[in-house]
Amino acid sequence: MAIEFGSRKETFPNYKVYETMLAGRPFKAEMGKMCGLSNASAMIRYGETVVMCNVTMSPKPREGVDFFPLNVEYEEKLYAAGRIPGSFMRREGRPGERAILTSRVVDRPMRPLFPKEMRNDVCITMTVMSLDPDCSPEIAGMIGASLVTAVSEIPWNGPIGGVQVGLVDGEIVLNPTYEQRRQSDLALTVAATMDKIVMIEAGANEVDEDTMLKAIKTAHEEIKKIIEFINRIVAERGKPKIEFQTVGLDMDIFHAIKEQYLDDFKAAMDTDDKNVRDAALLPILNDIAEEYPDLSDADLDLISYKMQKQIVRRWLLDEGKRVDGRGINEIRPLAAEVGILPRAHGSGMFTRGQTQVLTTCTLGGTKDSQLMDDLTDEQTKRYIHHYNFPPYSVGEARAPRSPGRREIGHGALAERALVPVLPSMEDFPYTIRCVSEVLSSNGSTSQASICGSTLALMDAGVPIKAPVAGISCGLITEGDRWMTMLDIQGVEDFHGDMDFKVGGTRKGITAIQMDIKIDGLTYDIIADAFEKCRKGRLYILDEIIKPVIAEPRRELSRWAPKMFSIVIPTDKIKDVIGKGGKVIQEICANCNCKIDVQEDGHVFVSAIDQEDAKRAIFTIKTIVEDPEIGAIYKGKVTRLMNFGAFVEIAPGKEGLVHISKLDTKRVERVEDVVAVGDAIVVKVTDIDQQGRINLSRRDAIIALEARKHGQNKE
């Protein structure tokens, strides 16, 4: 029987490669060849970075949910960088921190553009299959996610585009290369539609607001080209958008309830206390449930949400009134405190209204740094910030869970805000871990974590370059009308259109994270939010943090390890470590310390007792430095001979003390003065041409006595 082989054209009749340029580098989208069972897919090639992007949607809406079930997954495959995973099974496990943060960065601009009433599960997957360090896989994934969703039949009000922005030598650079990112004072990611900004995420070295806004505008111009590229593909192969089945409340019933209970809801909402508000709303909902017994719990939750949302927004837009009575630019009552935990190396508590965060700072050695097992070239992370959000912080009665995406994202934001002000490894050779425990939450806990971290770091004696504070700005829009308000609390965040978080110093911005629930922001709104956050940040720095702790403590906590560092020749590393690690283990045991020797010759020594660390440093110096004539050492007697004793002044370095130089008086027998294993002081008197070292205990004793008498006279 003959076998007929189909041609490539017959196998993939819709296959096509679309090409454009992105920030000066080739960008390609291959479609119609792979992943034929997903709603839409594309293989994105940016330089030599390759990301497979897919979108799928369930055919039926999910029942019993009051939200749009969107799931965005960014996957890093280590084969993309030619690496084998370091896990026991040698396969990728759960998403790492970088993958989770990238998933959030893509989710945030995509989500607001889906219909809010849709309840079908939608999953967007971006898989990094090849990594070119000069071409960002995050940006390739974001653009690919936008492309496949726009081409698919899934209802979505896109497309969007995204770029990264750097600031190298004062010049704005789009999608910076690997080397440019290392030199850049700005790591900004912007996502936008053709006419509005939908997402901003940034870390920066104290960049001013004007420069930041200029960078955003520059990014938007490049994004418009990306969107034009996507629109051309959609025009050619886009599928008709489907009609989705809405699952919601009977609006006739809602309007009847609104007319009857609106004043009751307003009275319950008019308070600055979250607990009082929740308690006042409960009997109203009970009355509604009795009057309308056919309503489900989900219906009641939706009614409460809609009523609260309308009240909060109408008060702000029509009356300029906030639920807690504050002015639009007024910050909630603030308090700061340091030194709360006596055994922690540093601690600080920051309170803003009913939001309260306690942050601790722990100092460790270089070996305590976090190992990174992802596609990044950074093998270890020296500064770590963890954010914990226990159930009791919002009054919930349930057991704590492991950190989720939200906790990881908030921790990363606070971490990003503090990194630019940390001292260099050379000036402060410590691993630093801050942990923010949210004690009470009513909005802006991530910004309270930034303030708490500043307090804890300065309390620990970490010589940060400048204090950092964080604050958020909210937004309410209606058509062309809009209003921003400073320091939003939980109910304003929940029912508002934006949470614009900015961290920074007096000099400039160090971190930004912008979340929105609408189709985007204009430049005017962004500029207004920047200015409000700048004024709020300066107020917190000058009026709250500075009076409590104006500068880092001059001394570390007595419980913190004392760290010292030296640089040794790389060819001497083997001598410090010794065969099988014998030498370094002996130093650690004798000096009660930890030692980390790095490939470039940097040696870090940490010990609780400062004198232990100094002894270890001295021992290392004696190993790597040639003995100096006239120098005094403390050595160990290793062998006894009739004519003298051999003394080891450093591992592998031994000299002879002749019997005539063993003591200040005449010595008949070597055994009368020293024994094997004794620790004695010796002075180097001579080193011959063959490198043999001659030592004198007598001269060392005389020199030390003379030094002692000289100090007494002074």
Features from the language model and the residues they span:
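Extended amphipathic alpha-helical scaffolds
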Residues: 2-58, 242-377, 561-575, 583, ...
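Conserved glycine-bearing catalytic or ligand-binding loops at nucleotide- and phosphate-handling centers
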Residues: 2, 66-75, 141-144, 295-300, ...
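Glycine-rich, flexible beta-strand/loop modules in the N-terminal catalytic cores of phosphate-handling
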Residues: 38-122, 128-130, 135, 201, ...
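Conserved helix-loop functional segments at active or binding sites
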Residues: 108-116, 151, 340, 365, ...
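Flexible, glycine/charged-enriched surface loops at secondary-structure junctions
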Residues: 116-122, 157-159, 226-244, 275-276, ...
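Long, basic N-terminal domains or extensions that often function
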Residues: 2-245
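Single-stranded RNA-binding regions, centering on S1/OB-family and related RNA-binding modules
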Residues: 559-564, 568-714
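Mobile "lid/hinge" segments at catalytic clefts and subdomain interfaces of large enzymes
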Residues: 153-268, 457-554
